[in-house]
């Protein structure tokens, strides 16, 4: 399938004149349209700053002490070029010979800006002399003097007392707001009265559904240039209420990736102006939910201003507040404090602040359906706030799509953030580190070898935009993906609602099975992303509840629709590979379903064997551990059915310790039985004979199972040149294994009625002013007025995150009462799951009345031992087989990767 052709990718010639057709500053703004009809029929809008309007031109602000102006004809006499002002495109470089390079004009002097190390946050009026007093020049003979003059204290903010008049375009409120001089003085930009993407922030008050964004005549800056910019990479950072450090961590990683692509001067796609092909979109889920410190960081970057947003436009509720700005600032984090400094590369930013909390799936609707439809990007990258991509990881993801035309989606390696290993001291973090590592070494390579990865993590993944599109009938991957937004209410079936807790799994399946297409999914080992993992048991349980329920029901959906793969255009061999993978997933899911019973049976068989070896002590331990096992498991069920993890943390921690002791006892039993078997074989046969030793079925199954898992994990980790987790996290993972089975699984199944994401939308945001159009088509708005106000507001935002963030203790809100239908379904699932595992236990142990079918006690014991031996052999050999299958898949992935790298060695540079 050929990819849709977007606009030309070639960078602008540096001699082009560029101006924005949407110049709409948020100081006193009037529209000077030729006629109402001209405005109504135009695709562009244009407004004029009052100091430059209607023949009253004067300039209130010049960052240079000398006051020298831009020498273009327009700047000398704007009224003489009235028509040109309305028709000229957005021009980031108004003067061809200006020193700003390809992205703007740099003033000849900035106050204190030569000192790169100067802190952003200083005392009163730290940004330099009063720009409204041109006569105050301490060095009239030297316009380039570096020493700043003493300055008066800024006047109080007057921004709420000024009313501006603006013209709405097609009923949409769109404003261009001047950037605070405090920020503007630190970056290259056009000189007044010229303006560019660095001097103004663009605000749009969206009053529509994301799907209607384009139809309602909303647009984005990239489409307003004389030569619209092609978006090769569209990156979205989704967030809820993450603090400033988490957001800054992600944003820093993204900026470094853009700098890396800007540095690839020999690339056919990237290079000096690579930043023009990349748009970074930040979507925040709810105006009342966003962390004020994070919002202040966005303001420091220039992409947000307080006092601009509106509640309603002509009686229509605003659904999202959209801010656009090309920032030249970057972030750094030192000792937990976020700092802002001048960056090396401009970054096109789009900040979408949703009015209501509508969950992450709705944030993705704004990204794909609203903004994606306007920009028509090639590759879309999804990142969660808090995940930090490696310095070239975004490029590596893009490269996977560039090398494989039929790659519809790709993901990288998600790593647990360890802070130089310090967090490994927490056993819960170490356990998750091991889990992530083995998944990236065994599971993802195996699935990538088949071409179908069951889930591309939403925390760090990428998709080809054209592959996501629906067909003419409106059916396709995005249609299935966004169906989940409507599944979180009473109108949804509980099965479907749980399934859409993992809608990214549904999206992956719909991509590879898309009708008449042959898209595949790939794992990119060289692309990495670090993320924070839960550090407390309550957090961990809540997170895994959603993961386990969503993945289980989504896997059932994929397997039930596995034959949909035949509607695709894949080759017969590829379809056969998919079917083999589906069989593997079915077996894995069956083991997951019976994990509770399997673990208890292994525990009972091994401890029963151990009591014969230890005598009386073994029998006492066997009885004590068996009763405690059952008691703790019942306690876990009761807590899961009626208590929140946050309110039962001590109970859960006690159970974690108990299951750790149980696992340690099991490992001791395995080693002890193995050693005793070897000693017995040597004693009986007068020497060591491996063939005779393997005739002992319990010993043989134990050895094969251990070798096929633990030893294989070490071998494959060494082959992948990443073995350190085996030494730092392996023991913790072993001890936590029963917790995964007996706590996480039980809590997940006991809470299938809870289809929330752990967030509530009951907080009400502060009321904003509304905008209503008058008879002449104009509207009055309240907004900041002059440079002093803008600077004071900017300083206020900087001080919000000037100190280290301290976590506040969250007061839990009253839980909403769940519907009886959901609770009934939950009870049915739990009962069915419990009875399945109880039936398996009774069958293997010949208990629950099955022992009465044999009258002879010796024969009954023999029959029980035989059933236990057969069961243990089936389970452990199955584990060995699945492990071998994963190993082969991982090796095949590695071989293909090495061969591909060899073949590309002499290919052109990307």
Swiss-Prot record:
Keywords: Cell membrane, Cell wall biogenesis/degradation, Glycosyltransferase, Membrane, Transferase, Transmembrane, Transmembrane helix. GO terms for biological process: cell wall organization; chitin biosynthetic process. The chain crosses the membrane at residues 366-386, 448-468, 583-603, 620-640, 655-675, 701-721, 730-750, 828-848, 876-896. It is a multi-pass membrane protein. CDD domains: Chitin_synth_C. It is found in: Cell membrane. It is an enzyme of class 2 (transferase). Its EC number is 2.4.1.16. The keyword Cell inner membrane does not apply. One of its GO terms (molecular function) is chitin synthase activity. Residues 56-156 are annotated as: Disordered. Residues 57-84, 130-148 have a biased composition (Basic and acidic residues). The keyword Transmembrane applies. GO terms for cellular component: cell septum; plasma membrane. It comes from the Eukaryota. Pfam families: Chitin_synth_1, Chitin_synth_1N. It catalyses: [(1->4)-N-acetyl-beta-D-glucosaminyl](n) + UDP-N-acetyl-alpha-D-glucosamine = [(1->4)-N-acetyl-beta-D-glucosaminyl](n+1) + UDP + H(+). Belongs to the chitin synthase family. Class I subfamily. PANTHER family: CHITIN SYNTHASE, CHITIN SYNTHASE 1. This is Chitin synthase A. It comes from Ampelomyces quisqualis. The gene is CHSA.
